[in-house]
């Protein structure tokens, strides 16, 4: 099968694919695009954003901004006031958030409650914990993972996009990104669901903290560079080896 035959096959059989990049021996050897996309266009990678945020946490760990993923979440939010009667939140660690084993007081993702607030990190912390305690059960979350990017800001004093640009994107040749904030709920929905090409943006809250569970826009080429980075054990970006191994 030649390139044109493959292009036609994917265009007919896989309408959701917009870009493909292939590497061999660390070198890009094949690219193609569909659905009006160009090579440098980005798309909303949705929940794959979680994996990128996990890498940023690993970088912060290597830099000593975070001491351990076993640290309690509240250690990094000393100004946060825990509500009366809440006990579980004190025991929740960064690892609980990263592995989707943190308990919450809500069922499902509280999109409206978090995204209509002025401080998404604080609102997410308000929902962390609950009466059931830490059960160790898998509990998939998207919105409330905002705590992780809030934690990055607490430790680095850099917004999510600035931290990513400086310590992840720049070193491996990914274009600098900027914040994108939706003024209305409709604009928010349009951003998350629209499949048309996007630019180099990261969705953020009113305080310019990037969303941790969704919202990052990358091209297939960008994602391939991150994949090569992981295969190269974090070089040239400095990442803790055991952290990479756990993520993989």
Residue ranges and their predicted role:
Residues 39-40, 107-185, 209-218:
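Catalytic-site signature segments of enzymes, centered on catalytic residues
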Residues 63-102, 155-213:
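Active-site helix/loop module of the DD-peptidase/beta-lactamase fold
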Residues 26, 44-69, 97, 148-152, ...:
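Active-site SXXK
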Residues 238-248:
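Acidic, glycine-rich loop-and-strand cores that form catalytic or ligand-binding grooves
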Residues 44, 76, 82-132:
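Extended ligand-binding groove/face enriched in aromatic
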Residues 7-38, 69:
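A short, well-structured edge-of-sheet supersecondary motif
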Residues 48-54, 91, 141-145, 220-223:
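Short alpha-helical patches at coil-to-helix transitions and adjacent helical residues
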Residues 32, 122-130, 197-207:
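The feature captures the short pre-catalytic strand/loop hairpin that immediately precedes
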């Amino acid at each position: 099968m030649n390139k044109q035959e493959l292009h036609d096959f994917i265009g007919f059989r896989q309408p959701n694919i917009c870009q493909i990049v292939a590497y061999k021996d660390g070198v890009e050897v094949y690219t193609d695009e569909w659905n009006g996309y160009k090579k440098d266009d980005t798309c909303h990678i949705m929940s794959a954003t979680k994996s990128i945020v996990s890498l940023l946490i690993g970088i912060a760990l290597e830099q000593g901004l975070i001491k351990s993923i076993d640290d309690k979440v509240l250690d990094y939010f000393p100004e946060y006031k825990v509500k009366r009667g809440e006990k579980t939140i004190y025991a929740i660690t960064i690892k609980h958030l990263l592995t989707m084993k943190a308990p919450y007081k809500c069922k499902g993702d509280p999109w409206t409650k978090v995204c209509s607030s002025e401080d998404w990190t604080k609102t997410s912390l308000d929902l962390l914990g609950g009466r059931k305690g830490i059960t160790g059960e898998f509990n998939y979350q998207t919105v409330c993972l905002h705590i992780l990017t809030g934690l990055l800001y607490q430790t680095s004093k850099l917004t999510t996009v600035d931290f990513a640009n400086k310590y992840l994107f720049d070193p491996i040749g990914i274009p600098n990104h900027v914040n994108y904030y939706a003024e209305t709920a409709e604009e928010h929905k349009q951003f998350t669901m629209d499949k048309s090409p996007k630019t180099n943006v990261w969705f953020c809250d009113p305080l310019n903290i990037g969303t941790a569970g969704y919202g990052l826009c990358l091209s297939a080429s960008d994602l391939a560079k991150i994949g090569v980075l992981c295969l190269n054990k974090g070089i040239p970006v400095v990442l803790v080896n055991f952290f990479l191994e756990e993520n993989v």
